[in-house]
């Protein structure tokens, strides 16, 4: 789960990874150098007595070549190889983690769109998630200023189904959501959230869309089986302290998706969509693309030219060798089982003075009705007394 706020490619997560790599490399460099204390830094033997060993090593770079040319024992060679393997494995794991983080939605939207809601009302997540699925948004009818309330988001789907993962294998669906609040509304700070609401929120971590838009909240991807219903703790603004806010009815927009997208922001297809023929002709050959899966389809056109269409692991072929196909004809099934949906809601920022005035009005109406009843009883008694005379 992406639990850090990333507004740019070089955001806090990437910086932390860089520092982690530096510390790891420094550690292995120290271990590597300590294997040969007699030959390192011959001009400065006190370097091992201080914490300047790395700087000294860099300053004495000519001695490095004499150092590595030193005749090594077998045990020392083995230690060097193990150190290098450990560094390479660490680099690969960190790089892989960084790539997965940067490719996780809603990072795509944050990096490519200043505002997630277009002028037409469509949320930009629909540019990559092409299938339409329902989402639900539950809001209170009205809230008081400077109070914390719940916005409940439901992303329903059949939890028995599995989606195609990036490596072509099957796995569970993730869910994500973007909640566009009115200006002034924001995520409630932890010290303002009631304990009961904290239990409903669980371990979810919400992000601002960017530092300039704290009223737009995003979350995901998170496991769909656990978080197909999410509670957003929202803090309402106070017009008494923020003069840009008024006591009005405000719209709230929700976008929610389950599963992976079909198109990347650069326009390329993912392996979670249908693949079509780039040209018409006859399929003359189908070969596996790699051990991990995928296919290379060779299509021979009417003029004898052969075109190779590449299909990544994931989609299943629905054509065979010798079959005649037309341009843009589907070569695979559509493996996508997820989709994106939008939902709008409204909430009233209620003025406490209006509420107090309404209560006073109701009391006045009740008293008026009571006095009318009493006056009617008095009038009936007077009429009855006059009739007796």
Swiss-Prot record:
It is found in: Plastid, Chloroplast thylakoid membrane. GO terms for biological process: photosynthesis. Heme binds at residues 105, 125, 128-129. It is a single-pass membrane protein. The chain crosses the membrane at residues 355-375. Pfam families: Apocytochr_F_C (PF01333), Apocytochr_F_N (PF16639). Residues 1-42 form the signal peptide. GO terms for cellular component: chloroplast thylakoid membrane. Its cofactor is heme. Binds 1 heme group covalently. GO terms for molecular function: electron transfer activity; heme binding; iron ion binding. Keywords: Chloroplast, Electron transport, Heme, Iron, Membrane, Metal-binding, Photosynthesis, Plastid, Signal, Thylakoid, Transmembrane, Transmembrane helix, Transport. The 4 large subunits of the cytochrome b6-f complex are cytochrome b6, subunit IV (17 kDa polypeptide, petD), cytochrome f and the Rieske protein, while the 4 small subunits are PetG, PetL, PetM and PetN. The complex functions as a dimer. Belongs to the cytochrome f family. Component of the cytochrome b6-f complex, which mediates electron transfer between photosystem II (PSII) and photosystem I (PSI), cyclic electron flow around PSI, and state transitions. This is Cytochrome f. It comes from Pleurastrum terricola.
């Amino acid at each position: 789960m992406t639990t850090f706020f990333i507004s740019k490619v070089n955001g806090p997560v990437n910086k932390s990874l860089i520092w982690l790599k530096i510390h790891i490399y420094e550690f292995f460099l120290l271990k590597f150098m300590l294997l040969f204390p007699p030959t390192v830094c011959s001009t400065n033997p006190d370097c091992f007595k201080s914490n300047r060993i790395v700087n000294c090593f860099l300053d004495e770079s000519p001695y490095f070549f004499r150092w590595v040319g030193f005749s090594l024992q077998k045990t020392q060679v083995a230690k060097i190889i193990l150190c290098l393997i450990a560094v390479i494995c660490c680099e690969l794991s960190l790089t892989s983690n960084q790539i997965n983080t940067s490719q996780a939605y809603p990072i795509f939207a944050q990096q490519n769109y200043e505002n997630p809601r277009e002028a037409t009302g469509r949320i930009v997540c629909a540019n990559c998630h092409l299938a339409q699925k329902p989402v639900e948004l539950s809001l209170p009818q009205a809230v008081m200023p400077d109070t914390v309330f719940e916005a409940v988001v439901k992303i329903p789907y059949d939890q028995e189904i599995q989606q195609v993962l990036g490596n072509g294998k099957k796995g569970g669906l993730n869910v994500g959501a973007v909640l566009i609040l009115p200006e002034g509304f924001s995520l409630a700070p932890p010290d303002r959230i009631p304990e009961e609401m904290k239990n409903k929120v669980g371990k979810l971590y919400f992000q601002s869309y960017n530092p300039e838009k704290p009223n737009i909240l995003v979350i995901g991807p998170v496991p769909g089986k656990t978080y197909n219903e999410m509670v957003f703790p929202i803090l309402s603004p106070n017009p008494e302290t923020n003069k840009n806010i008024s006591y009005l009815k405000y719209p709230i927009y929700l976008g929610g998706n389950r599963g992976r997208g079909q198109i990347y922001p650069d326009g390329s297809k993912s392996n979670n969509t249908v693949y079509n023929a780039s040209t018409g002709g006859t399929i003359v050959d189908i070969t596996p693309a790699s051990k991990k899966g995928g296919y290379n389809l060779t299509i021979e056109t009417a003029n004898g030219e052969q075109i190779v269409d590449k299909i990544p692991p994931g989609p299943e072929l629905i054509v065979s060798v010798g079959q005649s196909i037309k341009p843009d004809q589907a070569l695979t099934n559509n493996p996508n089982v997820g989709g994106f949906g939008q939902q709008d809601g409204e909430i009233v920022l209620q003025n406490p003075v209006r509420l107090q005035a309404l209560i006073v009005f109701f009391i006045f109406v009740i008293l008026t009705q009571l006095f009318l009843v009493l006056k009617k009883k008095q009038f009936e008694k007077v009429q009855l007394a006059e009739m007796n005379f």
